[in-house]
């Protein structure tokens, strides 16, 4: 329980810690990784290079401290309160996908408190140190409890979270996006998972060592295999190219083995008959395809709105599969936004890249892998697609009453869309989102 004395200290020092958060987290990672080099395998070295991981840690720690100060009554370990639950669950699921263990938390706490002392100097009195140590252990205890539940549900062992999987198919869906189908390499059964969940994929890289990244499962359960859909992350001004995504694109072939975690992730398709609104951008379409496929198979009468934004139809991953699955639904509205789009000619199929404008028609029924031509085969069912030019416009989206909304895409995209949804009156509790990589949006509710 956070004591009254510690709450008072946190109140007077949280602004100071927040103001020096970048320096504190940089010192933390420097200290931690120098003392425990094997932990480099747990952390995304690309995000380390850009500082994104440090910013995410700072947002989570300061966000939890702020949450404790806003929560009335005593804070109970393992019961962080509704406002922070989504953030905590997201972090715990990410940790579970990497095999984070309870015995690693004391090391983290030691170096985090040492980093606070290094940066803030004499301002960190014994009283201040005790308060932040207390806050850290409330956070750690809540994470450990949630991670234990995840390991138990998934039947996984944090001491050995990886299982070997064999690549059975490799499909290039756009010039930058690759889908890999996988089956267990040994006698392990195919794990159960929920639409919207992801796996960590671990690979051994020259000069870097073992690195893991998270990839959504992009096919609904029940297919007899898992599928991940991977965007090749290009180098930018301040960030190197994605090491793991480049390895998967350049080096992995059918028949190769990959190490995968058990499926995790808390942003999953809600059961029931409430209308669904699935909004994505870029590779964020991957979990939406799993949700769409699951709904088409089990609840084809459910009201569904699908909205996707991309650079162009040619850059839209799994576009054909999205169109095919939408055609299996009886009450679906499908909107796409393309920044560089030449809509189809009048009377042409939706995936025809020729000139034209307006509402268009899309193909179905569902393609199993999203491979093949984007033109519909003769005689297949069609679903109406409304295609727009430019960036997504939340005001143009149909929003059924009582809908559950799911977002996945770059954090700036989701921040803007979420703000637009709130402005239109969608309750915050009905908006869920997934972020991959180090999460710079860690302090926002889900």
Task: Tell me the role of every PLM-derived stretch.
Residues 1-162:
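Globin-like tetrapyrrole-binding proteins
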Residues 155-257, 296, 310-312, 323, ...:
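Ferredoxin-reductase
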Residues 196, 284, 410:
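Short, conserved phosphate/pyrophosphate- and ester-handling motifs at nucleotide-, phospho-/glycolipid
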Residues 207-216, 265-272, 277:
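Short, Lys/Arg- and Gly-enriched loop/turn segments at beta-strand edges
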Residues 268, 277-299:
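Phosphate-binding glycine-rich loops and their immediate beta-loop-alpha structural context
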Residues 275-277, 305, 404:
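Structural motif
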Residues 307-446:
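Reductase modules of NAD(P)H-dependent flavoproteins
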């Amino acid at each position: 329980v956070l004591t009254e004395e510690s709450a008072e200290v946190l109140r007077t020092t949280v602004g100071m810690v927040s103001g020096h958060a970048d320096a504190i987290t940089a010192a933390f990672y420097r200290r931690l990784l120098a003392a425990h080099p094997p932990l480099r395998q747990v952390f995304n070295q690309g995000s380390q290079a850009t500082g994104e991981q440090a910013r995410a840690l700072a947002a989570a720690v300061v966000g939890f401290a702020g949450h404790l100060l806003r929560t009335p009554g005593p804070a109970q370990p393992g019961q962080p309160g509704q406002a922070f639950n989504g953030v905590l669950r997201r972090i715990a699921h990410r940790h579970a996908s990497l095999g984070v263990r309870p015995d690693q938390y004391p090391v983290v706490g030691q170096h985090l408190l040492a980093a606070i002392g290094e940066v803030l100097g004499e301002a960190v009195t014994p009283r201040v140190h005790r308060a932040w140590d207390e806050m850290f252990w409330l956070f750690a205890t809540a994470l450990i409890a949630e991670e234990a539940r995840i390991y138990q549900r998934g039947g996984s062992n944090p001491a050995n979270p990886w299982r070997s999987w064999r690549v059975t198919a490799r499909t290039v869906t756009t010039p930058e996006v690759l889908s890999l189908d996988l089956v267990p390499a040994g006698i392990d059964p195919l794990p159960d998972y929920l639409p919207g969940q992801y796996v960590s994929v671990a690979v051994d890289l020259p000069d870097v060592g073992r690195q893991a990244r998270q990839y959504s499962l992009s096919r609904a359960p029940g297919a007899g295999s898992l599928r991940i859909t991977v965007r090749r992350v290009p180098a930018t001004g301040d960030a190197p190219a994605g090491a793991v995504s480049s390895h998967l694109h350049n080096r992995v072939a059918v028949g190769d083995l990959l190490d995968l975690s058990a499926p995790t992730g808390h942003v999953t398709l809600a059961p029931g008959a409430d209308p669904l609104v699935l909004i994505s951008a870029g590779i964020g379409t991957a979990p939406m395809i799993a949700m769409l496929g699951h709904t088409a198979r089990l609840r084809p009468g459910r009201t569904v709105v699908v909205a996707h934004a991309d650079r162009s139809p040619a850059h839209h991953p799994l576009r054909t599969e999205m169109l095919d699955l939408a055609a299996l639904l009886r009450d679906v509205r499908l909107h796409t936004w393309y920044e560089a789009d030449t809509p189809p000619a009048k009377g042409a199929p939706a995936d025809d890249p020729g000139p034209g404008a307006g509402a268009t028609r899309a193909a179905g029924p569902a393609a199993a892998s999203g491979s093949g031509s984007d033109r519909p085969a003769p005689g297949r069912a069609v679903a109406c697609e409304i295609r727009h030019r430019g960036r997504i416009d939340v005001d143009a989206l149909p929003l059924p009453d009582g809908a559950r909304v799911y977002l996945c895409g770059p954090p700036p995209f989701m921040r803007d869309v979420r703000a637009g949804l709130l402005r239109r009156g969608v309750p915050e509790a009905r908006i869920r989102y997934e972020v991959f990589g180090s999460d710079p949006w860690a302090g926002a509710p889900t």
